[in-house]
Amino acid sequence: TVNVYGADWCGDCKRAKAALTQYGVAFVWHDIETEEGAEEKAIEISNQKHIPVVTFADNTFMVEPSATQIKAKLESLGILQ
């Protein structure tokens, strides 16, 4: 499962969600402004306060990834060809 921790006002978060949607990858959105514990979880994962934090099924994460970085990661996991 792909998880995205971010906020509606965050441009990088919108780009990450758009990239995942474009690639046809289902993800779970965690809004750090409204979901209890989401902000703390994002900080716990990345040890920083930057968003978005995107987590992947192989227990890795990316902070503020570009669409190209997301695509490369999905390809490395075999999710995209």
Where are the regions a protein language model picked out?
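Short active-site oxyanion
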Residues: 1-3, 26-28, 58-60
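Local sequence-structure signature of Cys/Sec-based thiol-disulfide redox active-site neighborhoods
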Residues: 1-23
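Short alpha-helical
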Residues: 11, 36-37, 69
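Thiol-based oxidoreductase modules, predominantly thioredoxin-like and allied folds used
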Residues: 25-39
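Short amphipathic alpha-helix with an adjacent loop that forms part of the alpha/beta core around
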Residues: 39-45, 74
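Non-catalytic, surface beta->alpha helical segment in thiol-disulfide oxidoreductase systems
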Residues: 56-81
